[in-house]
């Protein structure tokens, strides 16, 4: 099965790429745009707090992102309460940004772990108001199931703390989450290099979202290309089906007809 025939579907929308990327931490907007292009990503996330919605047309970040080429995913990065996150999503919608939102409600500044209690509260409100909610959450299958039951269009468990580059720290929880929910599972945060992205996709999840892993690399453009390849390779490997792990060797050549 080729990657071209294998689509990511979120709330009825089809995407060819299973890689989603952020727009922060780049050296320049020009570098960001080039990285987006080579990443092959179709969904681009933007922190609403970083965008001066009143300055459209005056060098605003959104002026550099082609809405015909990318699906914009506004996020609530920097929000620590449900009320703040809901207010941020409402402002984004009023400014003409997408109803498709990445919901973040953080618990503290040191770990940037999600506050699941506030997250669930915000998700309930936003779903009722017609938003398509993609929540950043902990790698807790119970919380992910609750988010699905609320009506979230996907769940986005962390692979490791935001910006840590530690990779997928608890693959077994990610596997359980994938078994538990029917909505897409997108690993968000912690991916540090291409092998991390490939490992995530080999678990059978539906996609990966990253920012620092690309923007923080020594060469963000090259890393964006590497992540593009890694996500596609990991997905294809999952679909192909890996061989089982065994303690002892198995000969790869037939033993029939051996001399002696």
UniProtKB/Swiss-Prot annotation:
1-deoxy-D-xylulose 5-phosphate binds at residues 163, 189-190, 211-212. It is found in: Cytoplasm. Gene3D superfamilies: Aldolase class I. Its EC number is 2.8.1.10. InterPro entries: Aldolase_TIM (IPR013785), Thiazole_synthase_ThiG (IPR033983), ThiG (IPR008867). It catalyses: [ThiS sulfur-carrier protein]-C-terminal-Gly-aminoethanethioate + 2-iminoacetate + 1-deoxy-D-xylulose 5-phosphate = [ThiS sulfur-carrier protein]-C-terminal Gly-Gly + 2-[(2R,5Z)-2-carboxy-4-methylthiazol-5(2H)-ylidene]ethyl phosphate + 2 H2O + H(+). The active site is at residue 102. One of its GO terms (biological process) is thiamine diphosphate biosynthetic process. Pathway: Cofactor biosynthesis; thiamine diphosphate biosynthesis. Keywords: Cytoplasm, Schiff base, Thiamine biosynthesis, Transferase. The keyword Thylakoid does not apply. One of its GO terms (molecular function) is thiazole synthase activity. One of its GO terms (cellular component) is 2-iminoacetate synthase complex. It is an enzyme of class 2 (transferase). Belongs to the ThiG family. Homotetramer. Forms heterodimers with either ThiH or ThiS. Catalyzes the rearrangement of 1-deoxy-D-xylulose 5-phosphate (DXP) to produce the thiazole phosphate moiety of thiamine. Sulfur is provided by the thiocarboxylate moiety of the carrier protein ThiS. In vitro, sulfur can be provided by H(2)S. This is Thiazole synthase.
């Amino acid at each position: 099965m080729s990657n071209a025939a294998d689509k990511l579907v979120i709330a009825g929308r089809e995407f060819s790429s299973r890689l989603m990327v952020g727009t922060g931490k780049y050296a320049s907007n020009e570098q960001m745009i080039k990285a987006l292009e080579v990443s092959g990503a179709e969904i681009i996330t933007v922190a609403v707090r970083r965008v001066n919605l009143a300055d459209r047309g005056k060098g605003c970040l959104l002026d550099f992102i082609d809405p015909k080429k990318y699906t914009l995913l506004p996020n609530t990065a920097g929000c620590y309460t449900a009320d703040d996150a809901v207010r941020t999503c409402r402002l984004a919608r009023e400014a003409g940004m997408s109803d498709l939102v990445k919901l973040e409600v953080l618990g503290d500044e040191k770990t940037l772990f999600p506050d699941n209690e506030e997250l669930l509260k915000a998700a309930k409100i936003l779903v009722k108001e017609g938003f398509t909610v993609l929540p950043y959450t902990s790698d807790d299958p119970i919380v992910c199931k609750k988010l699905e039951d609320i009506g979230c269009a996907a769940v986005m468990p962390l692979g490791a703390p935001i910006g840590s580059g530690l990779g997928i720290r608890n693959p077994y929880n990610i596997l359980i989450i994938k078994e538990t929910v029917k909505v897409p599972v997108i690993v968000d945060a912690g991916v540090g290099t291409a092998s991390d992205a490939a490992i995530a996709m080999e678990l059978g999840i539906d996609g990966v979202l990253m920012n620092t892993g690309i923007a923080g690399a020594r060469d963000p453009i090259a890393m964006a290309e590497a992540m593009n390849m890694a996500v596609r390779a990991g997905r294809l490997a999952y679909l192909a089906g890996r061989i089982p792990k065994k303690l002892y060797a198995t000969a790869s050549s037939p033993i029939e007809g051996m001399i002696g």
